[in-house]
């Protein structure tokens, strides 16, 4: 079994760092991630592009990949403007290097089906998802994809966002808290400060979330919108969640713009370990 190529520190809201239960939970999480990392890839269906009707005259496109017997499904929200420009053959016009987009197969290898979500059909030009992520229409589009996955797979459905994709994951979960929403969300490299007129995740109505939430952050994330110190505030605002936990990761390499996909912000060099740990956490819920 290969060693996990990342230093993972799971921080739990209910316990202090030296509490025995904290140590047991951390050891269990690492064991689960190591087990997933050592397993062979699951048999899977061929990736396919799916267009689901959502609002009148609008469809939501995503790349769907499922292992032979999925245990859960994850809708993956990329950061940036979110317009992946996915063509019918499954090629990305933009965003192929995004952390979640480039790591999609790792989730499938762990037994999790993925829907790599594009902008909807009425947002296929600039600004794509910019200025749209907190809208009712965005939540309606997500509701349709969640329903499709549940109907096809009969498994729990999660939203996983990275960077600006965390604004989508959190906003959709809040909007659909009354019904039709996800079974849980994962926020990686969360937007914790905003200077473009948008909304930081910590300024959303997180108290309405009654689902599990995992926060994953690199301890050296240099993006000005994502200071690791403010994950404390994020966890405090998730008090209503039945299970709100935080993973702080270290290691890897960083190159380019600190807010881009191959900086620490995008878990460069840590993809396999981080995804395995996320998968283990999701599948344990």
For the regions a protein language model found, what residue spans apply to each?
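Short, surface-exposed "cap/lid" segments of acyl-processing enzymes
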Residues: 67-106
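Alpha/beta-hydrolase active-site loop
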Residues: 99, 127-152
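The feature captures the conserved acid-bearing segment of alpha/beta-hydrolase catalytic domains
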Residues: 189-248
